[in-house]
């Protein structure tokens, strides 16, 4: 299935810090058995310890896999960090960078997020660069200003880099809260992101929505012209719900 400008729809699951070997095995088996990727391009971003399990379970399928973070450095004395070339060795295609939980809980700066995106690209991975505003910023009328600020160092990487990325709009106030931006609210921001990319192959860059996407609201969100799929949190941990989103 394709979206506006023939951008292929993409649905990515972000497992966050959930799962165990037994639960993962059951979930991955259900996804593979359903041939979920027939509906659209799909992937799951899993905790680092489960990359080998995920790769083994999905190898040869149409479903990709990836990680939830990456170091800005290729190697070195960076205890606890995981480098992009390491992720590539596990067959990762995707890696999330700049998720709101990383920005908030680990004080990741806009520049660090861009540096991580660059490191991912250099290793042949596709970074999924997350941007979004808090409830306070939205209510203060600062949504677009915040997102433009977050995007600035990413756009500075240039057009050739940008067309190899995916962007994800995740309104912080809608993550894990049960609240969801209306399709019209989400489209407004996605359209503004597309405007910010003007001159940088804006029509080629996929922009996902990532704020409490569920089977019940996926179709209305994905019907918007500038929403190219979803970055799915909790719903990606339930095979039936994740597949419903993919089929929306």
Swiss-Prot record:
Q: Name the predominant localization.
A: cytoplasm
Q: Return the protein name.
A: Triosephosphate isomerase
Q: What class of enzyme is it?
A: isomerase
Give the organism, scientific name: Bordetella pertussis (strain Tohama I / ATCC BAA-589 / NCTC 13251)
Superkingdom of this entry's organism? Bacteria
Q: Which family does it belong to?
A: Belongs to the triosephosphate isomerase family.
Gene Ontology molecular function: triose-phosphate isomerase activity
Its catalytic activity? D-glyceraldehyde 3-phosphate = dihydroxyacetone phosphate
Q: Which CDD domains match?
A: TIM (cd00311)
Active site, UniProt feature = 99, 170
UniProt subunit comment: Homodimer.
């Amino acid at each position: 299935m394709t979206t506006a400008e023939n951008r292929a729809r993409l649905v990515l699951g972000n497992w966050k810090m959930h799962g165990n070997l037994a639960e993962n095995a059951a979930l991955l088996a259900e996804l593979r058995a359903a041939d979920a990727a027939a509906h659209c391009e799909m992937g799951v971003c899993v905790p680092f310890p489960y990359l080998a399990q995920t790769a083994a379970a999905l190898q040869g399928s149409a479903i990709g896999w990836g990680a939830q973070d990456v170091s800005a450095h290729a190697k070195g004395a960076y205890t606890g960090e995981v480098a992009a070339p390491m992720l590539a060795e596990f067959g990762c295609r995707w890696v999330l960078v700049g998720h709101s939980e990383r920005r908030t809980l680990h004080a990741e700066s806009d520049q660090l997020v861009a540096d991580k995106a660059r490191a991912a690209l250099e290793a042949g991975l596709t970074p999924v660069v997350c941007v979004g505003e808090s409830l306070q910023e939205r209510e203060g009328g600062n949504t677009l200003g915040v997102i433009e600020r977050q995007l600035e160092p990413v756009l500075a990487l240039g057009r050739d880099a940008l067309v190899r990325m995916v962007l994800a709009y995740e309104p912080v106030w809608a993550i894990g809260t049960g609240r969801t931006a209306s399709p019209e609210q989400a489209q407004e921001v996605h359209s503004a992101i597309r405007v910010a990319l003007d001159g940088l192959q804006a029509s080629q860059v996929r922009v996902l929505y990532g704020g409490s996407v569920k089977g019940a609201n996926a179709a209305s969100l994905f019907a918007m012209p500038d929403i190219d799929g979803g970055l799915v949190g909790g719903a990606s941990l339930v095979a039936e719900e994740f597949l419903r989103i993919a089929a929306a």
